[in-house]
Regions:
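Mobile amphipathic helical/loop "lid" adjacent to a hydrophobic cofactor/ligand pocket
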Residues: 71, 75, 80-179, 195
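Glycine-rich FAD pyrophosphate-binding loop
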Residues: 27-51
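N-terminal Rossmann-like dinucleotide/flavin-binding domain of flavoprotein oxidoreductases
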Residues: 62-66, 70-76, 209-220
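Conserved beta-strand segments of alpha/beta enzyme cores
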Residues: 32, 54, 80, 219-222
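Helical element adjacent to the flavin cofactor pocket in flavoenzyme catalytic cores
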Residues: 185-233
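Glycine-rich active-site loop/strand segments that organize a redox cofactor
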Residues: 46-66, 123-141
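Conserved donor sugar-nucleotide recognition element shared by glycan-biosynthetic enzymes
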Residues: 45, 182, 205
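N-terminal Rossmann-like FAD-binding beta1-loop-alpha1 element of flavoenzymes
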Residues: 5-35
Length: 233
């Protein structure tokens, strides 16, 4: 059995992106730590697997280039990001329609304006929301918290816009489809998608946690071990 360090100050449970970031900070500050992960890989909800020559991503499907903290921890030049145009292609049950940001992709301005996924009021509200959340910082938001769904209703978005765009798009980010996630987190994510670009590493999303892992001493990581109890020895 592997011998564990005896002078651990910090135990980090889970080697997802947050756990890896914590481990990197502990190492930078010379704080003894142990990172424990139940799976045989790091990344948590951020990962990939290969089968028959194809890469299949697990959990989160894209990386947002506007996440400053993560960018500062990654070697961005080595993960070879490929970028998507800003916007979304939505199937309304009959045809595909485009909702794009006309301020960042002028070629799609007419397709966006004439899309019946949203009302004219919805389109105006999107632009107003985009403007109001420019430079948004979640720790400076003193507004009353509520669910994302309630926030969208209070902002005036139509049910069709919520069901056809917000729910499917943000369900893939929140990993829950009722939009019960905090409206403050929604505002943070929305603001970042409007300032950055959705991207995909050339070799799949697993490239991101693997890149973070390079900054951590392997002797401080324990894979395929599940934490079942936390208490005094």
């Amino acid at each position: 059995m592997r011998e564990l360090p005896s002078d651990i100050d910090t135990v980090i449970v889970g080697a997802g992106p947050s756990g890896l970031a914590c481990a990197i900070q502990c190492q930078k500050n010379n704080k003894p730590f142990l990172l424990i992960e139940k799976n045989n890989r790091v990344g948590g909800r951020l990962g990939s697997f290969n089968e028959n020559g194809y890469i299949f991503d697990l959990g989160f499907q894209v990386y947002n280039t506007a996440y400053e903290v993560t960018n500062s921890l990654l070697d961005m030049g080595s993960i070879n990001l490929n970028y998507f145009k800003p916007g979304a292609v939505i199937h309304d049950g009959t045809d595909f329609q485009i909702i794009s940001d006309p301020l960042r992709d002028i070629k799609q301005v007419f397709g966006t304006l004439f899309s019946d996924i949203s009302t004219l009021g919805d389109k105006i509200r999107i632009l107003k929301l985009k403007s109001s959340l420019r430079g948004y910082e979640i720790d400076r938001d003193n507004s009353k918290d509520k669910t994302t769904h309630q926030f969208l209703l209070d902002t005036g978005f139509s049910e069709r816009m919520i069901e056809m765009f917000f729910r499917p798009f943000f369900s893939g980010i929140f990993l829950e489809n009722k939009l019960e996630t905090s409206s403050k987190f929604f505002k943070y994510v929305f603001s970042r998608f409007n300032s950055g670009l959705a991207s995909l590493p050339e070799n799949g999303m697993q490239s991101i946690p693997d890149n973070l892992l390079k900054n951590i001493d392997g002797k401080n990581i324990l894979l395929e071990k599940k934490v079942v109890k936390i208490g005094e020895q």
